[in-house]
UniProtKB/Swiss-Prot annotation:
ATP binds at T29, L30, G31, P32, D86, G87, T88, T89, T90, G412, D493. It is an enzyme of class 5 (isomerase). Keywords: ATP-binding, Chaperone, Cytoplasm, Isomerase, Nucleotide-binding. It catalyses: ATP + H2O + a folded polypeptide = ADP + phosphate + an unfolded polypeptide. GO terms for biological process: protein refolding. NCBIfam families: GroEL, PRK00013.1, PRK12849.1, PRK12850.1, PRK12851.1. Together with its co-chaperonin GroES, plays an essential role in assisting protein folding. The GroEL-GroES system forms a nano-cage that allows encapsulation of the non-native substrate proteins and provides a physical environment optimized to promote and accelerate protein folding. Forms a cylinder of 14 subunits composed of two heptameric rings stacked back-to-back. Interacts with the co-chaperonin GroES. GO terms for cellular component: cytoplasm. This is Chaperonin GroEL. One of its GO terms (molecular function) is ATP binding.
Length: 536
């Protein structure tokens, strides 16, 4: 296929149009009075969402140059979501500002490599300043405030705080759908282990890249499944039972995986494979934990148990399975005496353990088995509302976990304003062009505050001016339209979310400003002219 190349200012202009297409769409959602964006969905009703990365993911532009710019900004949102679980809109707004300022500097004759050096220096300094300002999450109130700010709902904040109180800060919390209109919290028996699906082709929900199984059978073994013939007899029984099957094995050969995936895609049976968690003796014990929870017979190779001899009675049962890329959650609705015995055995082993390493592993297993799983059952009047509510709760959960990891900073964009005030005259370089890179990052720190105020119906410029005059921790409450002590009002952000937003925005901006050419594929129309399309 032929290629078309744009150079210099022309290339940067096209990329910038793509950046603006995404950023201008996403930034309307920022802050407590941010608006929603409606997304067309093929074969289903439109989605109305407030989540930056979900919006950015859906945007495809006809012009390939503009689309490259858009996809680079989507990467900012996606990376921030992967690392911190929230803050995607803030990252997008920061990236747009940095890229605009960076391109202006390059077009005015600055050396892009030196400007890039300044951007990298400034972003690392901002990240350090944010960590220095971070306050540890000490109590339930902080957890509730973080979740409330992220979701834009006091009710959701309260439910997430209750969930963490019941299963612990490191406990397993999942979001599910309720059959009613109310959003409720339920704690059930279950555990989560750190292995996801063995192949992405098992995924049933492409949007969230998750597998959901209901009323599933469970095969638990420390065998390496090398041939399909080993498990054909039990698979035939599973097909007759018309129930989904979860296979948890030490390993499964690619050839076997291929056959299982092909049969799943054809609809022959519904099966998902995950590798066993842990390694060595600890792996065997974790597999036993899974077997006890699911009431499965553990197919143990040291006892010369063979997969070919498996009967239906050897398989376990589980009410619900949620499998993601990196973890699997098993949820049971019934209490088991065997599970209680297993928990007591672990407690005894911890008491008698003389090894720190062994004690740590035992404590982790005990926490997984005894902590249970908190289910936030989301209720709504319509499917559209349900999807939006689930996204908000998932974002709030991620934000809360990020806050527990790195602590919190004052919210409403104030933390970035304070860092701006500390660095605007102190972070200096002898090189003029490096300084331009520093300045464009530092100046961009004011943009989230501007956008939050603008979305709430206030003058962004006036609010930024007033923010600069406020004492530490005091700032603009966009929801109420007044200046308050933000910490006292519970307007806080996870440090990790804010820090990752700055780092990822600066990373893409630094790379984009060094771009001097853009290469795309093109189709020729009937007149043999280039068909590159226009922005759509």
């Amino acid at each position: 296929m032929s290629k078309k190349i744009l150079y210099g200012k022309e290339a940067r202009k096209a990329l910038l149009q793509g950046v603006d297409a995404i950023a201008n769409t996403v930034k309307v959602t920022l802050g407590p009075k941010g608006r929603n964006v409606i997304l067309e969905k093929a074969y289903e009703s439109p989605a109305i969402v407030n989540d930056g990365v979900s919006i950015a993911k859906e945007i495809e532009l006809k012009n390939p140059y503009q689309n490259m710019g858009a996809k680079l900004v989507y990467e900012v949102a996606s990376k921030t979501n992967d690392k911190a679980g929230d803050g995607t809109t803030t990252a997008t707004v920061l990236a747009q500002s940095m890229i605009h300022r960076g391109f202006d500097a390059i077009d005015a004759g600055a050396n892009p490599v030196l400007v890039k050096e300044g951007i990298e220096l400034a972003s690392l300094t901002v990240a350090k300043k944010l960590l220095a300002k971070s306050k540890k999450v000490d109590d339930q109130e902080d957890i509730q405030n973080v979740a409330s700010v992220s979701s834009g709902s006091q009710e959701i904040g309260k439910i997430i705080a209750q969930a963490m109180q019941k299963v612990g800060k490191d406990g397993v919390i999942n979001v599910d759908e309720s059959k009613g209109f109310e959003t409720e919290l339920e704690v059930v028996e279950g555990l989560q282990y750190d292995k996801g699906y063995a192949s992405p082709y098992f995924v049933s929900d492409r949007e969230s890249m998750t597998v959901h199984l209901e009323n599933a059978l469970v095969l638990v073994t420390d065998h390496k499944i090398s041939t399909v013939q080993e498990i054909v007899p039990i698979l035939e029984e599973v097909v007759k039972a018309s129930r989904p099957l979860l296979i948890v094995a030490e390993a499964v050969e690619n050839e076997v995986l291929g056959v299982l995936v092909a049969n799943k895609l054809r609809g022959t049976f519904n099966v998902v494979v995950t590798n066993a968690p842990g390694f060595g003796d600890n792996q065997k014990e974790m597999l036993k934990d899974i077997a006890v929870l699911t009431k499965a017979n553990f197919v143990f190779k040291d006892l010369n148990m063979k997969l070919a001899d498996l009967k239906m009675d050897d398989l376990g049962n589980i009410n619900k399975v949620i499998i993601k890329k990196d973890n699997t959650t098993l949820i049971s609705n019934s209490k088991s005496p065997e599970l209680e015995k297993r928990i007591q055995l672990l407690k005894t082993q911890i008491k008698n353990s003389t090894s720190d390493y062994e004690t740590k592993n035992l404590q982790e297993r005990l926490a997984k088995l005894s902590g249970g799983v908190a289910l936030i059952k989301v209720g709504a009047a319509t499917d559209t509302e349900l999807k939006d509510k689930k996204l908000r709760i998932e974002d709030a959960l991620n934000a809360t976990k990020a806050a527990i990891t790195e602590g919190i900073v004052v919210g409403g964009g104030k933390a970035l304003v304070e860092v701006y005030q500390e660095l605007k005259d102190t972070l200096v370089s002898d090189n003029k062009e490096v300084q331009q890179g520093i300045d464009l990052v530092v100046q961009s720190l004011l943009v989230p505050t501007y956008q939050i105020a603008y979305n709430a119906g206030f003058s962004g410029k006036d609010v930024v001016k007033q923010q600069l005059l406020q004492p530490s921790n005091f700032g603009f409450n966009a929801k109420e339209g007044k200046y308050v002590c933000l910490l006292k009002e519970g307007i806080i952000d996870p440090t990790k979310v804010t820090r990752q937003a700055v780092i990822n925005a600066a990373s893409i901006s630094a790379l984009m400003i060094t771009t001097e050419a853009a290469v795309v594929s093109f189709k020729e129309n009937k007149d043999n002219n280039f068909d590159l399309g226009t922005q759509e």
